[in-house]
Amino acid sequence: PPGDLRNCLVALADREPLMERIMQYRFKGDSPLAGHSFGNLFIAAMAEAEGGMEAGLSATSQILNVRGKVVPSTLRDIRLKAEMTDGSIINGESEIPKAHKRIRTMAMEPADAPATASAVQAILNADILIFGPGSLYTSVIPNLLVTGIRDAVIKSEAVKIYICNVMTQPGETDGYGAFEHVQALIQQAGTQFLDYVIVNDQRVTAAQLAQYNEKGSMPVTPDIKKIERLGIQVIPTRLISNKDLVRHNPQKLAQVIISLVYRLRLFGKGIQFFDYFFMRQSMRELKKK
């Protein structure tokens, strides 16, 4: 979805706070632009001006001084649809959580949307593939619905890590523990493909719990033993940010991932010297926080 591309660009950008705020801004009022994201419109304009989405993302990346590269899974306009456990079909990303039904499986239209060659190549060349965190059924799983992407993920020799959400998402993952999140990913891939799952084992405060209970959201239980029975190694960690909202602490999460890179000595596979040096510096900075 365009919003996911926008969020990835903003997250990787070496940006000023104003630029981040404007890229995430949604128009208000009664104008025809009301509800639309400036960032989405900007990316769409760049894609049209540059002759395609990949070229548009590349140009946007230059403007935002993005470190890394954001590559779409497919260039086709797709529509998500969910089959619920009661047999009903819900169409559209925004409509799926509104149904407040348990999801059996996800699909997309057109079902044969081709993967971008650059995305497939990036997956096959990767040392690590990281899934999540994010909306399980409408952000993470949609990538696996693109056949070429799913096949590349399964074929890839990269270490595959899933970062499980810390709270359930109303309308999508009601009542889910970490095990159900992992099960859903495996079901959509058609095979067990994960090597590691990072789960939160930090307790949510009573004040935070009360705030989320009003919205129908609950902490995701780590389910360590159940996941390990699938042949997946679980990394339980205190991951919650100290702020009011229950979110992953980005510094803690980065430290867990970088520590795993060191432990597996993945920097010897394909990560270049300057990347290795950057990671060492990053680790030192994270330990100070």
Identify the meaning behind each predicted range.
Residues 76-137:
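Active-site gating loop/helix substructures
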